[in-house]
Amino acid sequence: MVFVISVILAIIVILTIGLILRKRIYDKVDHQEKWKMDIMARDVAQQISKIKSLNLSGETQEKFELWKGRWEHIITKELPDIEDHLFDAEDAADKFRMKRANNILTEGDQKLQNIEVKIEEILEELDELLSSEKTSREEVAQIVPTIKLLRKTLSQSRYQYGKAEKFFDKKLDEFDTQLATYEDNVESGDYLEANRLIQVLKEEIAEFEIKMEQFPEILRRCKQDLPSQLEQVLAGLQEMKNDGYRVKHFGFDKEIITYQDQLKNLQQQIEQGDITDVSTKLDEIEERITEMYESLEGEAIAKNYLEQRIPEYEKSISEIAATYDDTKLEVEELQKAYFVENNDMERFFTIGKTISTLREQLKELHKEMDDDQKSHSDLQNIVEDGFDKIEQLEEQHEEFKKSIENLRKDEMEAREKLIEMRRQLYELNRKIKKSNIPGVPGFIWTRFETASAKNSQVVDVLEDYPLDIAKVQHALSEAKQAVDQTHEQIDIMLDQAYLTEQVIQYANRYRSQQPDLNGKLKEAERLFRNYEYELSLEHAAKAIEEIEPGALKRIEENQLTLNR
């Protein structure tokens, strides 16, 4: 019984699902049916008929026939095929062949979309034709007065166009011919060709307007301005030659002739109404003319510079040479008393060699001023470079003079430092004597002897002849280091001795109470009397710290307070 019920329920479910799926297919069929009816109801035929009233020919007639044929094919062939597909889909759905029905509907949907695309193309092309016909009429209304205005401008300014006037006249006639061709195409109904023609004509007129506007200036520059400028450069060249300026090396004469020939060729090109690249070439020539003027101006400035500065240049070389010679004599005298470092002497001799080179260059400069082989600009560069070198030589010479002057200064400073170090050793000796300590350890006397010996070495070096300041500085440095170390060791020794006395005195309060302490303090006192202050301090400090921890620190602090 349960099985039967299950089977019945399964059948009901299957039927229900089938009915639902079939209902969906029916809905899709209805949708495509409405879509098809909507397409059939559109006024495409009416849109096509709008141009039927026009007098058509040529490509426009071909387009009309093509659009008409496309629409008729859609109405008579493609849409009826859609109807058949819809019947097939319903039939498949009635038989519950859902997959086939869906495939048929999918194919039908694609065909309807393709039809929509075709209709859209037809309507767009129709609209393009109608709008182009209107647009071309509007543009012709603008073109005609433009051509008249261009003719008027040409007529009133013929002299500005020279022989090229014929070219411009001919071009305007061609525009009139193209307008007539446009009218013929319109009258015969070939609107598409007429529109294409008017668009081309519009672009040509725009280019022609620009050419007419630019042409007078280009012609004037090519025929008048630049030839005149080149003649002026030639005249300037000749005048500068007569005045003694060196301009031959520029080679401008040949270059100007080349440009004059180039301008003649450009004039022939312009007379044909062709200004292609002419402006660019004229700009290049004009730029080169500017460069020529700058070069000639530079040569004139250079000549004036040389006339004014060469006497000053000669004087500067003579002065630096005389200064060098004076310093050389001074150095020779100085070397009798002092040793001058080889590096310093090499730098000094290099200055002399450079001065000799400048003298030779000056002789060569005078020759070149007379032989007319080098331009004044090149000679100016030589003189300017020479002035720079003289300035450098003056700086180097001044540095060298300071270095040799420092020899005497360094000697005096060394002697003063030696006196100061001797005074320090004397004061240290007095300090030891006033300290009332039992005696001085041997290593302290060794330090004293070393410091004294180092001072003696400074004296010996100072007495050398010629005096070597580098050796003096080295000996002085070693002596100072020895004195500083002696000073440091004496201060440490005295501090240790004073602190040891303070510790022993402080520990005496416990001496009678602590037998062990008494023995340790006696050892510390023995070491103290034998000048072994560091060991004595260690013994005394250790002994008092065992009795009273922290006592050493308090004693040290008290001693620091007293020293202040």
Swiss-Prot record:
<keyword id="KW-1003">Cell membrane</keyword>
<dbReference type="InterPro" id="IPR010379">
    <property type="entry name" value="EzrA"/>
</dbReference>
<keyword id="KW-0812">Transmembrane</keyword>
<keyword id="KW-0717">Septation</keyword>
<comment type="function">
    <text>Negative regulator of FtsZ ring formation; modulates the frequency and position of FtsZ ring formation. Inhibits FtsZ ring formation at polar sites. Interacts either with FtsZ or with one of its binding partners to promote depolymerization.</text>
</comment>
<dbReference type="Pfam" id="PF06160">
    <property type="entry name" value="EzrA"/>
</dbReference>
<keyword id="KW-1133">Transmembrane helix</keyword>
<dbReference type="GO" id="GO:0000917">
    <property type="term" value="P:division septum assembly"/>
</dbReference>
<keyword id="KW-0131">Cell cycle</keyword>
<feature type="coiled-coil region">
    <location>
        <begin position="251"/>
        <end position="436"/>
    </location>
</feature>
<dbReference type="GO" id="GO:0005940">
    <property type="term" value="C:septin ring"/>
</dbReference>
<comment type="similarity">
    <text>Belongs to the EzrA family.</text>
</comment>
<dbReference type="GO" id="GO:0000921">
    <property type="term" value="P:septin ring assembly"/>
</dbReference>
<keyword id="KW-0132">Cell division</keyword>
<feature type="coiled-coil region">
    <location>
        <begin position="168"/>
        <end position="215"/>
    </location>
</feature>
<feature type="transmembrane region" description="Helical">
    <location>
        <begin position="3"/>
        <end position="21"/>
    </location>
</feature>
<feature type="coiled-coil region">
    <location>
        <begin position="468"/>
        <end position="537"/>
    </location>
</feature>
<dbReference type="GO" id="GO:0005886">
    <property type="term" value="C:plasma membrane"/>
</dbReference>
<feature type="topological domain" description="Cytoplasmic">
    <location>
        <begin position="22"/>
        <end position="564"/>
    </location>
</feature>
<feature type="coiled-coil region">
    <location>
        <begin position="101"/>
        <end position="140"/>
    </location>
</feature>
<protein>
    <recommendedName>
        <fullName>Septation ring formation regulator EzrA</fullName>
    </recommendedName>
</protein>
<feature type="topological domain" description="Extracellular">
    <location>
        <begin position="1"/>
        <end position="2"/>
    </location>
</feature>
<keyword id="KW-0175">Coiled coil</keyword>
<keyword id="KW-0472">Membrane</keyword>
